[in-house]
Amino acid sequence: MFDILMYLFETYIQNESEAMVDHELLTDELTRAGFHQDEIYKALNWLEKLTALQDTDAYPYLTRVGSKSVRIYTSEEMQLLDTPSRGFILFLEQVNVLDFTTREMVIDRVMELDTKYFSMDDLKWVILMVLFNVPGKESAYSQLEDLIFEEQEGPLH
């Protein structure tokens, strides 16, 4: 499912393509690209739920809390998000790339992935997808993109 999400994000979402509107055409294209139909439906459902997370009435855990609050991860979350991943999320909060709401959206979307192994690179992509889909987070999205691409280039000597 994550491969499909990556494909969709790189091919359609970042390019703001209109193909995302017609699920049937998109499903046909993804099937022709070699993806299995059940995984396609899971990925599309994942994206729909990401959009639905912006409705805070339906998701009470996305209500505003004080800036001094500390996130306590569940055992299930800690199994999927290792210590470096949780540290990266905390770092992004400290540099104001993520706020309480977007952090919870990221954790929610990570936990909905159908996977037992989740890498730091996977986490970065999920965070990019969340920030891209939240209105008003364009600056945070750009900031994270800069962090990711600067990290990949390495230090200059």
Curated annotation (Swiss-Prot):
A Pfam family of this chain: DUF494
Family annotation (InterPro entries): Smg
Disulfide bonds: none
Protein family (similarity comment): Belongs to the Smg family.
Protein name as catalogued: Protein Smg homolog
Organism: Colwellia psychrerythraea (strain 34H / ATCC BAA-681)
Phylogenetic placement of the source organism: Bacteria, Pseudomonadati, Pseudomonadota, Gammaproteobacteria, Alteromonadales
Gene: smg
